[in-house]
């Protein structure tokens, strides 16, 4: 021990290590006979391993000797020298190993890493007494210690001008090549140079932004700290939410403000001008090798120095980063569409799909179905960086795509890991940073931890490098981890996008979030269902309206049973059904209100999205849970729990079938859920009627199932509390409409939010359970419930019902007047064979009928004991049915009628192919006085007379012009109550009596009830119209372009005045137009002149105007419910004739159309008028073609060009035909006739 005299200041090494003095005379390898000398180590690695083992064994001895030996307190350098002073080891063999690569150094850092990290000297001194945005850089670039990772490069793509036009299509095209890398670079065409608005002087010098202070040396190597500052990730949130709500959400999962977490402290505010000065000053000071010259490092030099600082720091390096700057406040670098657009170039870039302000909501991105502006997801973020400012390893929220564009500046280095290696990256980081993950299990969600790509690569994780330059895009793929840093001052902008292929990945993301109890950013179910509904809408437009637009074709191309969206929807439905089945049969199930998730609704336990379903309890009205955690919501009895479902099981199945391309499902979903506002379902119902072909269509009308009444999935008894809730929900089922005309004030009801699209139909939803014979209807009229135990229910029920218009064809009909519209059992069974019929339940005081509709059967839930009929609602006019088959309709001119079982049987015996438009069943005043409550009227009408009664024209009609009414006031446009109408006159001319109906409301009033609600005329009057032709159009051949009544010229336009559907008190002009629907023939369109948003389209002119009439009646009812007076009476069926309203029966217009068809190419029309005289310009009269010539014309139309030329040569030159040739031609014709007879 006396030989140990080394002090802290001695430079010479001691002859023997401290503490080994007494054993100095003994060789180390002589202690055991079987020991080998240390010099036998064959490699430096083996020697280093021996040193590491010896150093661990020496630690206790060194601790004991520290109090006795001055050397033990010397620092790491002295300890290192003592460890190297071992006679058996030749240390000269390791002198060539640098300090950075030495394993000895690594061992020493492991021993005293905490002390060394705490003792790192300051490399950057930021701020002073006078300002906070100045700096002094003490640390210097160390090229010798560079630790640049050896990685493969991510792919780079150079789209052409044509490829660059469609953003999502191009991303889809490169996905198979780029997704295996997780990241790629896209270099736009050289001509694409958008202006950067952030360089405007007002923003450059005047707009300040907040920054973060990043300690680069602690991004990877730091101790698990119990004290820290806020986290580095800002939670994506909606811009529209209030500051209070924003702050709350921000505290919960946004900027991690917990004092137990490591994070980035806030830095000073900068403008772009001052930040550039600060960033350039840092780079200049840090990379200056000496005072005599400046050095400009390459990207590779900066990369090597960055990872040296992260992995083996020697000084504390602080940098500033302006990250996550909301473009909504700071501004975007891309131009936006506005009236202030200065040039065509700006307008071009403002509309570009590569403009990050447009990208998330492009057609084909499911983010377009998110209504709110979510900062960072749908609203881009701006990033202003300097050298070494970093973005740490992370994936995008919900595993979305992200697109980053660099506006200007130094390169940005990216590192990407493909989605298939995401789990491997997480495992590798947990393995090497266990303390950090123990403290923060969600460490990777906070963007505060960097990790060496070299270490990831050594763990088998695929990592790729990408260098982004000014004017280039970087695209990251779903669940692809990425990180990086900036090489100097630059500015970039980024946003998310979600093509259809993201949907299954997004579903996995939200399920993962549920497991992690992590807050969501977007509603995945809302996006999925929104995309599915839009895809079905596109298929509707293509299949029924022949609108083969680019957008529609894009959506159609992604549909089908093998499509991604179909599989994603099926997977989500299966998950939902499993969860519902797990719950068993819920005691109380309700229809989810449309606005339920207008505010963010999340599971109180796992934060799962509640767009599709939710569970709740009366004890906590503002607290809901997902179906998985329904039992954990509260401690109340299970019977008190209620469940909200946006769609029932059958509706979800119909949605899936429609998305898969099933035509009937597309039709059902389009009618019931979409309610297309600008068109009707263009379907053809061809009905033969004495050589007349009529085309009928189903007209979809705006409806919102989400505004329906409460739904019970099974038959069960409910508590009074449930009944009160049903009554409360029922209030939302009152008739409502909405006008999209900007000049019209949007109407709102107390319990109904305004509809987002034009509405021409209202409905109640009534859902059945195919597993039960009973049915429960929550919230009948007036809030009452009706039950129908024992009624058979179809296995494929529909999810809404509307009063349907069904044509009736019969030679004898028995009508009775009762309170309410009553349909017989037989009539209902007849209608059940028509397919997808609908019903609309209307409110009426003191009555609460309920009706169910199962898609094939329509049955009421209340029995009428007196008449053996089933009662359904009565207060609404009938509306067009939705079926491709022939329907049966009883449409009285009043709100009340009944068809007995016996009478209805006669309906079935009538021809199902005959269509008769709704007509004016009327009753005289004297007769109604004698029968105040019920009267049996049996008019004997044959089918031809009945057709004429309903507004048709007979074959013998010599003049197609409209009739006039002497009892109507001129030009007032209102219906007047007169003793007879046109149908009555026509019926009397044929010897049939006129039947007048008594309104149910008046009967109810006479019986003591209060007379409320809209009035309907006792006598149906044809509306007297004066049509102004705007354009005659062009006549086309083909049977679809004419009928026995009128010719339908393509491009025909006319103008007529009728009650305004916006304000029924006023009259308004309507524009009627005939369009070309291709194979479907003519398409009839009517629109309100001063409100282009109100458009009605159908393949039948009469049904087209009937849609206008029904829309008018709905508005009258709505305004009447609001207490308005001086409203016109409800317009009954038959009050308007589509052909007349179009002007196609007006004599002047008819003459003009005839002039366009001098060759009589409209054969359907002229076949019924073989002797009509047409005046030519030379005042000569030409006789119309007779049947032989018409037959010849049909033959000629089927001939090809060569055959027509030969025929013309034969007919014009008599010399070509002698008697022999004529005989041969006749013989050939006779042979062909004989063949056809055989």
UniProtKB/Swiss-Prot annotation:
Named cofactor requirement(s): Fe(2+)
Record-annotated JmjN domain positions: 154-195
Catalysed reactions, semicolon-separated: N(6),N(6),N(6)-trimethyl-L-lysyl(4)-[histone H3] + 3 2-oxoglutarate + 3 O2 = L-lysyl(4)-[histone H3] + 3 formaldehyde + 3 succinate + 3 CO2
Disruption outcome: Semi-dwarf plants and reduced seed size. Small panicle enclosure phenotype.
Domain FYR C-terminal: 1079-1169
SUPFAM superfamilies linked to this entry: Clavaminate synthase-like
Known outcome of mutating residue 482 to Y: Loss of activity on H3K4me3/2/1
Amino acid composition bias (Low complexity), ranges on this chain: 706-719, 924-936
GO molecular function terms attached to this record: ferrous iron binding; histone H3K4 demethylase activity; histone H3K4me/H3K4me2/H3K4me3 demethylase activity
Consequence the record notes for mutating residue 396 to A: Loss of activity on H3K4me3/2/1
Transmembrane segments: none
Record-listed E.C. numbers: 1.14.11.67
Enzyme category, top tier: oxidoreductase
Effect noted on mutating residue 321 to A: Loss of activity on H3K4me3
Biological role: Histone demethylase that demethylates 'Lys-4' (H3K4me) of histone H3 with a specific activity for H3K4me3, H3K4me2 and H3K4me1. No activity on H3K9me3/2/1, H3K27me3/2/1 and H3K36me3/2/1. Involved in the control of stem elongation by regulating methylation states of H3K4me3 on cytokinin oxidase (CKX) gene family, which may cause increased expression of CKX genes and reduced cytokinin levels. Prevents ectopic retrotransposition by regulating the levels of H3K4me3 in two non-LTR retrotransposons KARMA and LINE-1 (L1) and reinforcing their repressed states.
Protein name: Lysine-specific demethylase JMJ703
Organism the protein comes from: Oryza sativa subsp. japonica (Rice)
The encoding gene: JMJ703
């Amino acid at each position: 021990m006396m030989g140990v005299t080394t002090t802290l200041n001695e430079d010479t090494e001691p002859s023997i290590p401290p503490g080994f003095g007494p054993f100095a005379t003994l060789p180390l390898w002589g202690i055991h006979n079987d020991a080998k000398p240390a010099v036998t180590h064959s490699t430096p690695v083996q020697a280093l391993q021996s040193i590491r083992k010896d150093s661990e064994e020496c630690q206790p001895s060194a601790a004991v000797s520290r109090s006795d030996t001055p050397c033990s307190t010397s620092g790491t350098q002295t300890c290192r020298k003592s460890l190297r002073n071992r006679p058996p080891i030749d240390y000269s063999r390791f002198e060539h190993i640098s300090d950075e690569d030495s394993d000895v150094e690594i061992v020493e850092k492991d021993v005293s890493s905490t002390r060394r990290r705490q003792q790192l000297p300051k490399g950057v001194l930021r701020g002073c007494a006078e300002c906070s945005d100045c700096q002094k850089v003490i640390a210097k670039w160390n090229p010798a210690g560079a630790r640049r990772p050896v990685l493969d490069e991510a792919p780079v793509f150079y789209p052409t001008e044509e490829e660059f036009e469609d953003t999502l299509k191009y991303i889809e095209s490169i996905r198979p090549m780029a997704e295996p890398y997780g990241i790629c670079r896209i270099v736009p065409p050289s001509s694409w140079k958008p202006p950067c608005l952030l360089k405007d002087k007002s923003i450059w010098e005047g707009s300040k932004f907040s920054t973060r202070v990043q300690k680069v040396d602690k991004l990877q190597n730091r101790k698990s700290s119990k004290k820290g500052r806020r986290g580095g990730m800002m939670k994506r949130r909606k811009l529209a939410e209030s500051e209070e709500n924003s702050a709350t959400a921000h505290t919960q999962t946004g900027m991690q403000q917990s004092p137990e977490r490591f994070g980035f402290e806030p830095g000073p505010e900068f403008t772009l001008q001052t930040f550039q000065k600060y960033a350039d000053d840092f780079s200049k000071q840090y990379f200056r090798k000496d005072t005599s010259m400046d050095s400009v490092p390459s990207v590779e030099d900066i990369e090597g120095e960055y990872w040296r600082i992260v992995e083996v720091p020697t000084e504390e390096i602080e940098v500033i980063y302006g990250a996550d700057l909301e473009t909504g406040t700071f501004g975007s670098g891309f131009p936006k569409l506005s009236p202030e657009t200065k040039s065509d170039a700006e307008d071009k870039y403002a509309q570009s799909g590569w403009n990050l302000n447009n990208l998330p909501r492009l057609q084909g991105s499911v983010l377009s179905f998110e209504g709110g502006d979510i900062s960072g997801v749908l609203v881009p973020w701006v990033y202003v960086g300097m050298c070494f400012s970093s973005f740490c390893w992370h994936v995008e929220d919900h595993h979305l795509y992200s697109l980053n564009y660099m506006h200007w500046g130094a390169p940005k280095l990216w590192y990407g890991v493909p989605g298939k290696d995401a789990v491997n990256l997480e495992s590798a980081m947990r393995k090497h940073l266990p303390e950090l993950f123990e403290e923060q299990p969600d460490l990777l969600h906070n963007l505060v931890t960097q990790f060496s790509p070299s270490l990831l690569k050594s763990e088998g994780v695929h990592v790729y490098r990408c260098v982004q330059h000014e004017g280039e895009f970087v695209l990251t793929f779903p669940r692809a981890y990425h990180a990086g840093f900036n090489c100097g001052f630059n500015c970039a902008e980024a946003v998310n996008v979600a093509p259809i292929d993201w949907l299954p990945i997004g579903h996995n993301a939200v399920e993962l979030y549920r497991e992690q109890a992590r807050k969501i950013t977007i509603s995945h179910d809302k996006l999925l269902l929104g995309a599915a509904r839009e895809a079905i809408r596109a298929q509707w437009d293509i299949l029924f309206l022949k609108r083969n637009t680019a957008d529609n074709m894009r959506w159609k191309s992604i549909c089908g049973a093998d499509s991604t969206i179909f599989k994603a929807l099926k997977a989500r439905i299966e998950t939902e059904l499993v969860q519902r089945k797990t719950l068993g049969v819920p005691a109380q199930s309700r229809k989810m209100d449309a606005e339920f998730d207008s505010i963010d609704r999340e599971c109180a336990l796992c934060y799962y999205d509640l767009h599709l379903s939710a569970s709740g309890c009366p004890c906590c009205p503002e607290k809901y849970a997902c179906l998985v955690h329904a039992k954990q919501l509260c401690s109340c009895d299970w019977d008190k729990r209620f469940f909200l479902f946006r769609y029932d099981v059958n509706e979800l199945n119909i949605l899936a079938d429609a998305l898969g391309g099933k035509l009937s499902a597309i039709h059902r979903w389009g009618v019931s859920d979409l309610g297309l506002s600008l068109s009707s379902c263009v379907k053809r119902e061809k009905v033969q009627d004495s050589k007349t072909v009529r085309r009928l269509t189903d007209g979809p009308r705006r409806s919102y199932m989400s505004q329906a009444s409460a739904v019970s999935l099974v038959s069960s008894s409910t508590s009074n509390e449930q009944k009160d809730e049903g009554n409360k929900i029922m209030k939302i089922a009152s008739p409502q409409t909405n006008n999209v005309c900007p000049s019209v004030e949007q109407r709102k009801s107390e319990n109904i939010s305004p509809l987002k699209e034009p509405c021409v139909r209202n409905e109640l939803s009534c859902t059945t359970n195919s597993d039960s014979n009973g049915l429960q209807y929550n919230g009948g009229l007036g809030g009452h419930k009706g039950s129908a135990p024992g009624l058979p229910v179809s296995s494929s029920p529909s999810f809404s019902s509307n009063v349907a218009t069904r044509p009736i064809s019969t030679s004898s009909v028995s009508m009775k007047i009762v309170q309410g519209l009553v349909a017989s059992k037989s009539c209902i069974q007849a209608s059940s064979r028509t397919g997808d019929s609908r019903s609309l339940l209307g409110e009426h005081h003191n009555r609460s009928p309920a009706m169910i509709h199962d898609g094939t059967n329509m049955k009421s839930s209340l029995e009428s004991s007196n008449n053996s009929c089933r009662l359904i609602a009565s207060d609404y006019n009938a509306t067009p049915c939705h079926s491709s088959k022939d329907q049966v309709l009883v449409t009285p001119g009043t709100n009340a009628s009944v068809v007995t079982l016996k009478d209805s049987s006669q309906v079935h015996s009538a021809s199902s192919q005959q269509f008769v438009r709704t007509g004016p069943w009327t009753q005289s005043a004297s007769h109604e006085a004698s029968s105040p409550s019920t009267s049996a009227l049996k008019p004997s009408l044959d089918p031809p007379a009945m057709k004429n009664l309903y507004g048709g024209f007979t074959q013998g009609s010599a003049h197609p012009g409209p009739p006039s009414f002497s009892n109507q006031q001129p030009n007032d446009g209102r219906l007047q109550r007169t003793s007879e109408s046109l149908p009555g006159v026509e019926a009397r001319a044929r010897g049939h009596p006129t039947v007048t109906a008594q309104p149910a409301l008046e009967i109810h009033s006479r019986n003591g009830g209060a007379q409320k609600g809209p009035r309907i005329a006792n006598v149906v009057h044809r509306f007297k119209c004066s049509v102004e032709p705007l354009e005659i159009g062009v006549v086309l051949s083909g049977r679809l372009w004419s009928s026995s009544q009128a010719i339908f010229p393509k491009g025909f336009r006319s103008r007529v005045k009728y009650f305004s559907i916006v304000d029924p008190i006023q009259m308004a002009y309507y524009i009627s137009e005939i369009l070309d629907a291709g194979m479907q023939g003519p398409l009839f369109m009517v629109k309100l002149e001063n409100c282009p948003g109100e458009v009605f389209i159908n393949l039948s002119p009469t049904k087209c105007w009937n849609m206008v009439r029904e829309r008018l009646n709905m508005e009258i009812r709505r305004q009447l419910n609001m207490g308005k007076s001086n409203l016109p009476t409800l317009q009954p069926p038959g009050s308007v004739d589509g052909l007349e309203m179009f002007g196609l029966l007006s004599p002047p217009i008819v003459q003009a159309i005839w002039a366009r068809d001098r060759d009589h190419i409209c054969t359907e029309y002229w076949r019924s008028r073989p002797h009509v005289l047409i005046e030519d310009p030379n005042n000569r009269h030409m006789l119309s073609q007779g049947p032989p010539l018409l037959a010849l014309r049909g033959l000629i139309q089927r001939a090809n060009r060569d055959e027509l030329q030969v025929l013309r040569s034969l007919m014009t030159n008599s010399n070509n035909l002698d008697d022999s040739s004529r005989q041969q031609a006749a013989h050939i014709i006779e042979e062909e006739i004989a063949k056809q007879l055989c």
